[in-house]
């Protein structure tokens, strides 16, 4: 089975050496994705706004893979400050409330101090149809 690499155009992917997503068969693995606007390489200060942008970035990668947020089966949330997590819930509920993937929230440092959340997902194409 061959794998297909998906890029968002983020400079991080090129500089570090990874793909935004990797597709193998009907499985899509989306890398940890932050709230950067990859076109401008800017990021909002607010964790809720970052969460919304994370989800938009993930949705774009999934679409390139032929999947959608409805196909997400596993999600991981990484936040430097666990106290920020409740502020993300409205955006997360809007994206995953009906999907209800398996989920984990971790508190850990991120690569840039401006990053307040990173989201990683796994999806199975067509599973949410």
Predicted regions mapped to residue ranges:
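N-terminal presequence-like segments and the immediate start of the first folded domain
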Residues: 1-56, 60-74, 79-129
């Amino acid at each position: 089975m061959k794998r297909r690499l998906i890029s968002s155009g983020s400079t991080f992917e090129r500089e570090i050496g990874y793909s935004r997503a990797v597709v193998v068969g009907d499985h899509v693995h989306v890398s940890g994705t932050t709230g950067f606007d990859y076109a401008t390489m800017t990021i909002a200060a607010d964790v809720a706004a970052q969460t919304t942008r994370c989800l938009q970035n993930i949705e774009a990668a999934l679409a390139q893979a032929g999947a959608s947020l409805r196909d997400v089966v596993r999600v991981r949330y990484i936040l430097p400050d666990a106290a920020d997590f409740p502020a993300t819930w409205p955006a997360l509920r809007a994206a995953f409330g009906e999907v209800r993937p398996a989920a984990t929230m971790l508190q850990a440092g991120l690569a840039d101090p401006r990053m307040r959340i990173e989201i990683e997902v796994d999806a199975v194409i067509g599973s949410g149809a």
